[in-house]
Design a protein with these regions (language model features):
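Short arginine-rich
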Residues: 41-42, 280-283, 424-430
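Helix-loop-beta segment of a Rossmann-like dinucleotide-binding subdomain
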Residues: 22, 32-71, 101-102, 177-185, ...
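Amphipathic terminal alpha-helices
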Residues: 301, 393-440
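Dinucleotide-binding Rossmann-like beta1-alpha1 core, especially the glycine-rich loop
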Residues: 1-34, 163
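Short, flexible loop/turn elements at secondary-structure junctions
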Residues: 50-52, 80-86, 94-96, 106, ...
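Flavin (primarily FAD) binding-site architecture
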Residues: 109-124
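Helical element adjacent to the flavin cofactor pocket in flavoenzyme catalytic cores
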Residues: 46-106, 198, 267
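C-terminal catalytic lobe of FAD-dependent flavoproteins
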Residues: 23, 58-62, 120, 125-174, ...
Length: 440
């Protein structure tokens, strides 16, 4: 009954600008026919429609890139450390060790689970964040992925927690835990969480086999939830807020902290904060971002007919196979166009142990997408690592391409490869092999 009420409310609140079909509620017999692998212990099921972000790390990059394009006087100081805040000057150290200072009129602290640490570094200790750890695993299970048929199963585990499983680039993404944590620098999916996910899958889908050998990648992060005295993590508000720390005698600028929030609401939250900043400066909004396309979403073909026309047009222009154009459009959106044009003028060579990722596209990313470290390419601009497609061989090939484009010497290239291997093992429980867990 609660699920039915919840789905009805979901439809009600989305009725004004509806773009998705209404929910359907399925009794046990119908639900088990639609999902034959699901446990017969279910009482009923519901179907509702939602959106998903297929490459959140890349979306972050595109937001930064679009911001730079919209405001030519802005700068993206990536991998820069806040080291001081004195006499109204905020000091930073860049990735090359160079130090510089900024005298801000206002600071927006969007550091997520690090918000309190940033506030302290700015001279104002706070306790705004009471984060919880959420872990996920990626499982190579073709039978499960096929049975999902593009759907996500959102279910209650045996202990009452809410979990989910859905198709992510041909793997089954399983999550998530909700464990109090305040250490974002050392978060990882631990053995207990992994066992919990496997046990939950076995309970939900008893006809299928699951074990640790099927896991190709894990990841974990801290939700920047507000500090709370709630007795259970699930009772902590998922709403967002933007508290203001007003200036004082030692800090002449205000700090606006972005507490809470998630991908579901990031555009609305950003709009609210931008309006708050404009109001403080006595200015009014000149441009609405509500319907502004982001990155590769600009001029993206809106339906299958438009998509086919786009692919045909640029396959003809570049003389590349339509399948290649389709692959890059799916991977990068309309940002694929300059990559396609570059491939058109070169001999296209695929990376070792891959079928669809070219040396040309990696070189283009290195030159054009604010790459500082090798990990930017394999963990953030592409999905090579999370897809299980990264190997010792293609990592070395990518490192050579990036080194050539960015002017690294052999010592720097070796350090970057080592750093990627350390991060993969420490944060993602991955030790690279000569062959991919999943070929791309």
């Amino acid at each position: 009954v609660l699920i039915k009420i919840g789905l009805a409310l979901y439809d009600y609140f989305g009725a004004r600008e509806r773009v998705m079909p209404r929910h359907r509620f399925l009794l046990k017999e119908t639900a088990t026919k639609e999902m034959p692998y699901i446990t017969p212990a279910i009482v009923a099921g519901g179907i509702y429609h939602d959106a998903k972000v297929s490459q959140p790390e890349r979306l972050v990059y595109e937001l930064v890139s679009d911001g730079l394009r919209a405001s030519p006087k802005s700068a993206a100081a990536n991998f820069t450390t806040l080291i001081s805040a004195e006499n109204g000057v905020v000091g930073f150290e860049g990735p090359d060790g160079a130090k510089f200072g900024v005298r801000p009129k206002l600071v927006i602290n969007a550091a997520g689970p690090w918000i309190d640490r940033v506030n302290a570094a700015l001279g104002k200790p706070t306790k705004m964040i009471g984060g919880t750890k959420g872990s996920h695993i990626l499982v190579d299970h073709p039978e499960l992925v096929k049975s999902l048929n593009g759907r996500m199963i959102y279910f209650e585990a045996d202990d009452g927690r809410i979990c989910l499983v859905y198709d992510y680039h041909g793997l089954a993404l399983v999550g998530s835990t909700d464990i109090p944590s305040d250490d974002p620098d050392n978060v990882r999916c631990d053995d207990h969480e992994t066992d919990y996910f496997i046990d939950s899958l076995r309970s939900l889908l008893p006809k299928l086999k699951f074990d640790r050998s099927q896991i190709v990648y894990t990841y974990s992060g801290i939700r920047p939830l507000p500090a709370s005295n709630a007795s259970e993590p699930g009772l902590i508000s998922r709403d967002h807020s933007a508290p203001v720390i007003e200036p004082d005698s030692e800090r002449p600028f205000p700090i606006i902290a972005l507490v809470g929030g998630k991908w579901t609401t990031f555009r609305g939250f950003a709009e609210e904060v931008a309006d708050k900043v404009l109001t403080r400066f006595g200015k009014t909004r000149q441009v609405s971002t509500r319907n502004l396309a982001i990155g590769g979403g600009r001029d993206y073909p809106a339906d299958d007919r438009a998509r086919k026309a786009w692919v045909t047009k640029y396959a003809t222009e570049t003389r590349l196979p339509a399948a290649r154009v389709e692959t890059l459009l799916k991977r990068y959106g309309t940002t694929a166009l300059p990559i396609l044009r570059e491939e058109a003028g070169a001999s296209v060579t695929m990376l070792p142990e891959t079928e669809t990722i070219s040396a040309t596209e990696i070189a283009w990313i290195a030159r054009n997408e604010l790459v500082v470290h090798l990990a930017d390419v394999v963990l953030r601009r592409t999905t090579l690592a999370i897809d299980g497609a990264l190997t010792t061989g293609n990592l070395a090939a990518i490192a050579s391409i990036v080194a050539r484009e960015l002017g690294w010497d052999d010592a720097r290239k070796a350090r970057e490869i080592e750093a990627v291997n350390i991060e993969l093992e420490k944060r993602h429980n991955v030790i690279l092999q000569a062959h991919p867990a999943k070929r791309r």
